[in-house]
């Protein structure tokens, strides 16, 4: 595959860069198509991404419809058929600025002003379209073989919510039609697994713009799953000596100034509220409250490690374009804990956290994950607490502990929390890009900021080390992950309805009611479908919509024999004694058997 660089030379594209170049060229072709259809369009940035490409564009008051996106894609195909040569050229600063001003590319002009040290700028031209770009690109538009516009969303200029909201148009591009077809098949699977779709079908949660974007509400079925997850992780934590607390969802601005969140995390926080001369803010995380709980009384080295846990409600001002059901919202519940320990206890505490993470993943059959040591970017003084010695000590300590524990990890710069490095455990869901579920963060910063101490063996006051950790992460996100992994077919212990009783006719309704009552007494979540519908309809509803683990199909034969006909998710049917069936289900519930 031939590509052209900004200096004009043509060469074979390195194989590992082919998709990037294809997608970057697709972004330019899409921008050209947009400009043809909307001459007043003003373009911002249009890069290739891991999975495709996008262009952020200012369309004034124009709101694009699905039909408009289809027309843009149609125009892109015209441009590829025109087989326009893609040619680079370079201009000195003054001429480059003049060119962009003449073409009314205001965002490009502003971007050039930001690049104050640059004396010249490179451009690529195809037909009438010119874009400021460093390349490389395909040599002709016809070389772009397979692409598709996928969606539009909003994006702030320079990712700053104080700036104008632009229209972001996304697309994908591949080497050939076969790859595009395979991608579309994957997308169909993604749509079928989407937790928002399944959540609506199963009545797990809902959203409403009147309540607010990014503020999902759990319905009875969904809250049942949520509570089971809460019970599961609390049991695990109690067995390890955790002490559970409950703290308020708000705090004073001064609390977050003390912690450093106000300086380093304010853009992700909701605006402050003024009450009786005091400023309050919804909390984005729980560390400051837990620091204050530790500070509530004096501590000795004998008290440590002290493990404080909470299922805590948090609020973050996520941009509207990033919101996604319960996977990412503006309100969520964090499986949070803070472990206060001595420096000598760091290794054993990190080891215990890691063991709990991996034990939990085994319980939920999570196998596709990777560990990342997230470090600060030393050049970013705004994002991170400015103490080089503290950072070097913390990063080296966590790196050494992970190495000693034999945990394979990669390192990523710029992904640390503002107060310390962290171990992130990223999962690869059934569909979509990986994201972080679990985390363990090492912190020498906040204990000092809150003047936390303990009396050591020698009688002197020392500052404890804090481990911030989340095993399930956000319960909301963890639930979204499980929904998409299982397609809503939760294991018996998690299922909102564990058994559905289906009388074949009204004649067996009384027997069905008796069986239902017996299951309820055994602690099983059961629902009786007494609608006057054909049994086939009831089975489909229970299996495809409610996705229950077990159905009891009760006809005259079962009523006469006093047993039950059991149908599982696979469609296999067996006849069992009632007590035998109850023993089977209660065993799965008690042992939290992962049988989806």
Where are these regions (language model features)?
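NTP/phosphate- and nucleic-acid-binding module
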Residues: 1-42, 50, 56-596
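Conserved P-loop NTP-binding catalytic core
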Residues: 45
């Amino acid at each position: 595959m031939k590509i052209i660089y900004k200096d004009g030379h043509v060469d074979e594209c390195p194989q590992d860069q082919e998709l990037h170049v294809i997608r970057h060229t697709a972004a330019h072709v899409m921008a050209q198509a947009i400009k043809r259809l909307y001459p007043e369009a003003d373009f911002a940035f249009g890069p290739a991404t891991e999975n495709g490409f996008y262009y952020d564009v200012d369309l004034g008051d124009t709101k694009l419809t699905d039909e408009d996106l289809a027309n843009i894609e149609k125009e892109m195909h015209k441009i590829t058929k025109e087989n326009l040569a893609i040619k680079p050229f370079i201009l000195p600063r003054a001429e480059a600025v003049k060119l962009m001003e003449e073409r009314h590319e205001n965002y490009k002009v502003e971007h050039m002003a930001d690049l104050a040290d640059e004396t010249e700028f490179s451009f690529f031209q195809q037909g009438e379209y010119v874009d400021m770009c460093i390349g490389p690109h395909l040599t002709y538009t016809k070389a772009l073989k397979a692409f598709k516009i996928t969606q539009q969303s909003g994006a702030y200029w320079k990712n700053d919510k104080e700036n104008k909201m632009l229209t972001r148009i996304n697309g994908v591009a591949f080497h050939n039609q076969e790859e595009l077809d395979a991608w579309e098949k994957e997308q169909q699977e993604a749509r079928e697994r989407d937790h928002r779709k399944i959540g609506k079908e199963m009545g797990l949660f809902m959203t409403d713009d009147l309540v607010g974007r990014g503020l999902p509400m759990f319905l009875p079925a969904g809250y049942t799953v949520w509570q089971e997850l809460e019970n599961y992780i609390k049991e695990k934590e109690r067995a390890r000596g955790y002490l559970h607390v409950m703290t308020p969802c708000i705090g004073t601005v001064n609390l977050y100034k003390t912690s450093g969140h106000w300086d380093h995390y304010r853009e992700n926080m909701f605006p402050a509220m003024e009450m009786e001369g005091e400023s309050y803010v919804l909390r984005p995380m729980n560390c400051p409250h837990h620091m204050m709980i530790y500070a509530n009384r004096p501590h000795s080295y004998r008290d440590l490690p002290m493990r404080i846990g909470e299922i805590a409600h948090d609020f973050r001002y996520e941009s509207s374009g990033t919101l996604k059901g319960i996977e990412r919202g503006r309100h969520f519940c964090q499986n949070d804990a803070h472990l206060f320990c001595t420096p000598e206890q760091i290794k054993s505490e990190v080891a215990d956290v890691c063991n709990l993470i991996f034990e939990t993943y085994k319980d939920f059959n999570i196998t596709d994950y990777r560990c990342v040591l997230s470090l600060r970017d030393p050049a970013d003084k705004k994002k991170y607490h400015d103490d080089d010695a503290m950072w070097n000590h913390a990063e080296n300590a966590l790196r050494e502990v992970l190495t000693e524990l034999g945990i394979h990890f990669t390192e990523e710069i710029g992904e640390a929390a503002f107060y310390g490095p962290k171990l992130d455990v990223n999962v690869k869901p059934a569909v979509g890009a990986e994201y972080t579920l679990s985390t363990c963060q090492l912190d020498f910063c906040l204990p000092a900021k809150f003047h936390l101490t303990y009396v050591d063996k020698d009688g002197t006051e020392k500052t404890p080390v804090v481990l911030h950790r989340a095993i399930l992460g956000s319960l909301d996100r963890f639930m979204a992950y499980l929904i998409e992994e299982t397609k809503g077919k939760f294991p018996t212990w998690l299922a909102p309805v564990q058994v559905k009783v289906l009388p074949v006719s009204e004649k067996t309704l009384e027997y069905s009611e008796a069986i239902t009552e017996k299951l309820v007494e055994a602690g099983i979540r059961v629902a009786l479908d007494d609608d006057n519908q054909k049994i086939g309809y009831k089975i489909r509803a229970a299996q495809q919509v409610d996705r229950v683990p077990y159905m009891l199909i009760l006809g005259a034969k079962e009523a006469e024999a006093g047993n039950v006909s059991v149908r599982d998710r696979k469609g296999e049917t067996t006849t069992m004694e009632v007590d035998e069936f109850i023993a089977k289900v209660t065993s799965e519930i008690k042992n939290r058997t992962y049988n989806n």
